[in-house]
Structures are given as C-alpha cells and as structure tokens.
Amino acid sequence: MLELRMKQANNCALIVVDVQNGFTPGGNLAVAGADQIIPCINQLGTCFDTIVITQDWHPHNHISFASNHLGKQPFDTIQLPYGPQVLWPSHCVQGTQDAELHPALDLPTAQLIIRKGFHRNIDSYSAFMEADRHTSTGLAGYLKERGIDTVYIVGIATDFCVAWTAIDASKAGLNSYVIIDACKAIDMNGSLQHAWQEMLASGVQRISSRNILV
C-alpha cells in the first residue's frame, strides 16, 4: 500500500485527463493498459485539495471522427482550418457509456469537470485551449483565481491530451509537471517521443509518483 509523503501545498492542483471508458480496455479508442494507472491516480488524488477532471464529450457528427469523412479511415490525417487533424474512431460520444468516467476512478474531492470536444467543428486535446488555439476553456483563469501556480498532470493519453494540457499549462505561466507513471500513451508513429520533445521544450517537467507518494 502506498502512503502519503505529504499533502501538496495549496498552490498546487492535480489535473486528471480523460480517464474514461472510451480510452480504457473495452472502449472505442482504448489505450493498452490505461486502466492500470487508475489506482495510482486515486492515491495521488488524496494529496491534493484542488483536483480538475477532463472528459472527452463529442457529438456523434464530430469533425475528428473518421466515420464522418467519406473514404477516410481511423488514424488518417486531414487538413482543417486550424491545421492537421488526426481522424479517430468514433469515441466518447455524448451520453454514451463510452464517454463516462471510468468506474474505478475515485476522486471524491474533485471540484471541476471540464468537458471538451463538444464543438462539432473543432477538436480538443488540451484542458486549457481548443485545437483551434483561440478558444479557451477558462481553466487558466479558474486556477489562477484560486491561487494555483503549479499543476501536476496525469491521465490518457500522454502523447495527445496530456501533452497538450501540460504545454498549455506552461504557456499560461503555470509550473507544469507530468507524472509519468500515472499516464498512458497511444505512441502512434513516434508520437510519444515527439510529444516529450515538445513538452520539454515548453518547460514541462517529468516526475514519478514517487516524488509525491512513498
């Protein structure tokens, strides 16, 4: 059993990214082994007074779904007005079991759930900013209003939504940490290595849960 090393300071928040049925085994966009990180996330949650959860929440006709583009297959890439877009299998559709938070996730003190990807024509990876890089979720203001200047990020997937969230946190002036053993990656065509290059270049720091738990 893991024991707490110490309660994180009041200026720290835990951001839990997309720990949903759709991204865990049996889901429509399952990441291998993603359910295995949930016990660690639950333990980390007991160390923080401020916890934010993100939830992918797509309409059935979302622009990122390959099924909505004639002749396209999942994991093809298309160009949209805001840049390249990976096409995904339909996943985390609003109101479906696939979109629900994983039942093993146990974070009773979580204060805020941010639903993202609900705009039909814009994808959303980051907890802070939509993929068009103009539309804010309001999370940066929410955290700063509460005196938060440091965020620890966990969840799914390391190379997409976790990475975009961590980079945008750093851009927002927050100290940004990714807890590597509380995340799982898709790692598609070198995407994990590329994501870490981008994160480190943006000032994101990588740590282990052992830095918080013993």
Swiss-Prot record:
Obligatory cofactor(s): a divalent metal cation
InterPro entries (alphabetical): Isochorismatase-like_dom, Isochorismatase-like_sf, Isochorismatase_Nicotinamidase
GO biological process terms on file: pyridine nucleotide biosynthetic process
Catalysed reaction equations from the record: nicotinamide + H2O = nicotinate + NH4(+)
Entry superkingdom: Bacteria
SUPFAM superfamilies for the chain: Isochorismatase-like hydrolases
Record: active site: 18, 116, 161
EC number: 3.5.1.19
Enzyme's top EC category: hydrolase
Binding of a divalent metal cation, residues: 56, 58, 62, 91
Pfam families referenced in this protein's UniProt entry, alphabetically: Isochorismatase
GO MF assignments: metal ion binding; nicotinamidase activity
Keywords: Hydrolase, Metal-binding, Pyridine nucleotide biosynthesis
Free-text disruption phenotype from the record: The nadB-pncA double mutant can grow only in a minimal medium supplemented with niacin (nicotinamide or nicotinic acid).
Known pathway: Cofactor biosynthesis; nicotinate biosynthesis; nicotinate from nicotinamide: step 1/1
Annotated CDD domains: nicotinamidase
Stored NCBIfam families: PRK11609.1
Family of the protein in this entry: Belongs to the isochorismatase family.
Function: Catalyzes the deamidation of nicotinamide (NAM) into nicotinate (Na). Functions in the deamidating salvage pathway for production of NAD from nicotinamide.
Name of this protein: Nicotinamidase
Organism of derivation: Acinetobacter baylyi (strain ATCC 33305 / BD413 / ADP1)
